[in-house]
């Protein structure tokens, strides 16, 4: 009888283990499928938005001028703030862009993040996956279909944020009860959830009420900058020097920053409890790779924009061809890095050495690109150099991350910041080339600073970040060598 019970118990344990293993494998398959589907949709969304950027992101629309947010089918007046008419049109374009972009990016990133957190409970997360994807798709489609120039209609886009908040609220409640079972120590306290949701609601309320007040305090809801008391009051606060206005500004920014911090209480709680580990950051890098892939494909399209005065000379301007050598230099650096890295793999290597090699390579690339762009005035040359160099930089990052499995979380976060900066630089160069094309003739990014344009500022920032990192590593490397030498001297003295 005892043997029969023991045999039954053993069978039960084996069955439970097999069932659990099958469930994990099934959840892993579903998770990988959803991640692949989301990746394909994300890449498609970004590629289409960028290829049709002048029509979608800048609001030119499709078809005749009646379906455009600009007066003419050109971006020549984009960010022209010299008249109330252009000021209002540009404000509405920027407002539309920020609302739709925020909703699109937030929902896509949220889905990628949640797929990581719910690897074991993926089936239960499926409804939220679909709903977040639906909101992302709506935002994407509105970029292609919504081109209203009426303030009230454009301001109605904020209600997308209300829908997003309600979805977030339902997800956070679901996540709290699910995570409470798997990680009771971290999710035992529901106060963080309540604080985050309350302050998110207050921020949303501010975003919704502000446009409503704006359009209802003027003589006409169709005019935002003419005979509008709200606009006049805002201008006075920022321009009229008085103690009252100073206190209002300080109080506004203080409460805004406080509300933003408290609205992200859950995030800070996870950071403090070290839930954002190396694997989580690597998961984020996948989204960055998708974004870079879209930028890479789009830049190939950007080369097609006509610049009659920017054609490359055929043998009559040797200096320009010297500038283009930056691209060949970047490729040579990549080859040398790959050869050196492969050679090092055959011998024992330290993580500090490999990191130093990475940072030196990135610093050389960012410095050479900045210097060439600083002295070169041809947009097409800058576009070629940036296109090649950033591709090399991202390739170097990819090689380093692929070959080093035990990168610290802090370093991964820093590399992530540098990658985002590289992508932003590439996007700005692409948009600058689009705006300065013959059809649009807009030099917005070139007129921000008298001595340096926005592209050069971004490249300088990229170099500065790499230079700061290499300075830190050089000091750390010197300290390690000093400690080793000191230890060797002590050992030699003991032997004597």
From Swiss-Prot:
It comes from the Bacteria. The keyword Nucleotide-binding does not apply. The chain crosses the membrane at residues 33-53, 89-109, 127-147, 154-174, 193-213, 247-267, 285-305, 320-340, 355-375, 382-402, 411-431, 455-475. It is found in: Cell membrane. Keywords: Cell membrane, Membrane, Transmembrane, Transmembrane helix. Its main location: membrane. One of its GO terms (cellular component) is plasma membrane. It is a multi-pass membrane protein. This is Uncharacterized protein UU048.
């Amino acid at each position: 009888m005892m043997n029969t019970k023991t045999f039954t118990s053993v069978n039960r344990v084996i069955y439970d283990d097999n069932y659990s293993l099958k469930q994990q494998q099934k959840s892993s398959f579903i998770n990988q499928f959803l991640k692949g589907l989301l990746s394909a949709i994300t890449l498609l969304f970004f590629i289409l938005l960028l290829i049709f950027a002048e029509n979608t992101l800048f609001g030119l629309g499709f078809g005749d001028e009646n379906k455009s947010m600009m007066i003419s089918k050109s971006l020549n007046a984009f960010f022209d703030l010299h008249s109330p008419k252009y000021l209002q049109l540009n404000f509405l374009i920027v407002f539309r862009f920020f609302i739709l972009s925020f909703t699109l990016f937030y929902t896509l990133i949220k889905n990628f993040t949640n797929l990581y957190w719910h690897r074991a409970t993926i089936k239960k997360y499926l409804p939220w996956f679909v709903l977040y994807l639906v909101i992302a798709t709506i935002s994407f489609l509105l970029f292609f279909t919504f081109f209203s120039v009426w303030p009230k209609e454009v301001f109605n886009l904020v209600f997308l944020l209300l829908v997003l908040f309600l979805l977030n609220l339902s997800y956070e409640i679901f996540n709290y009860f699910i995570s409470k079972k798997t990680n009771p120590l971290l999710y035992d306290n529901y106060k963080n959830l309540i604080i985050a949701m309350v302050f998110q609601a207050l921020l949303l309320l501010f975003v919704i009420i502000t446009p409503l007040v704006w359009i209802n305090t003027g003589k006409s809801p169709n005019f935002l900058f003419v005979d509008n008391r709200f606009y006049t009051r805002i201008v006075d606060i920022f321009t009229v020097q008085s103690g009252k206005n100073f206190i209002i500004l300080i109080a506004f920014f203080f409460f805004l920053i406080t509300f933003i911090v408290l609205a992200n209480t859950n995030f800070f709680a996870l950071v403090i409890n070290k839930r954002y580990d190396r694997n989580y950051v690597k998961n984020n890098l996948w989204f960055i790779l998708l974004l870079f892939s879209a930028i890479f494909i789009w830049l190939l399209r950007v080369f097609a924009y006509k610049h009659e005065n920017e054609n490359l000379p055929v043998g009559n301007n040797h200096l320009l061809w010297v500038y283009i050598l930056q691209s060949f230099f970047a490729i040579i650096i990549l080859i040398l890095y790959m050869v050196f890295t492969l050679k090092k793999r055959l011998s024992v290597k330290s993580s500090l050495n490999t990191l130093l090699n990475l940072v030196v390579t990135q610093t050389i690339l960012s410095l050479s690109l900045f210097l060439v762009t600083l002295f070169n005035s041809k947009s097409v040359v800058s576009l070629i150099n940036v296109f090649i160099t950033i591709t090399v930089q991202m390739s170097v990052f990819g090689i380093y991350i692929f070959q080093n499995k035990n990168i610290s979380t802090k370093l991964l976060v820093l590399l992530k910041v540098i990658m985002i900066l590289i992508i932003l630089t590439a996007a700005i160069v692409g948009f600058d080339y689009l705006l300065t094309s013959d059809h649009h003739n807009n030099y917005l990014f070139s007129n921000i600073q008298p001595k340096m344009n926005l592209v050069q500022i971004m490249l300088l920032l990229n170099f500065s970040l790499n230079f700061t990192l290499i300075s830190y590593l050089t000091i750390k490397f010197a300290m390690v060598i000093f400690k080793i030498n000191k230890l060797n001297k002590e050992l030699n003295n003991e032997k004597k």
